[in-house]
Amino acid sequence: MAGEGFKALSDPTRRRILELLRERDMTAGELAEQFNMSKPSISHHLTTLKTAGLVTDERHGQNIIYSLNTTVMQDLIGWFMG
């Protein structure tokens, strides 16, 4: 888990996505508006973050809402500081 988490955190765009999700849950479209990139590019970053367990998603009708998985973030920080 830690290896995937650190790999996911190595990209500045993904770190910024996590910062935004720390403020509030968002859709891929809302996140894409914060960057100069397409929704598919943001979705790729979100998939990487999901695979690392740093982000969770939940479908609400037509939308998928992404959230920061604070438990995994705390575990990752604990492992790093450990």
Task: Please provide the spans of the model-predicted regions.
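Short helix-to-turn junction characteristic of helix-turn-helix DNA-binding domains
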Residues: 9, 21-24
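Conserved segment of winged-helix/HTH DNA-binding domains
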Residues: 1-2, 64-82
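Base-recognition residues in the alpha-helical recognition helix of bacterial helix-turn-helix
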Residues: 19, 43-47, 62
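Beta-hairpin "wing" of winged helix-turn-helix
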Residues: 50-60, 67
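Short helix-coil-helix linker/hinge
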Residues: 8-13, 70-71
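A short acidic, leucine-rich amphipathic alpha-helix
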Residues: 31-32
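Pre-recognition alpha-helix immediately N-terminal to the DNA-recognition helix
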Residues: 15-17
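Helix-turn-helix DNA-binding motif, specifically the short coil turn and the N-cap/start of the second
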Residues: 27, 38-41
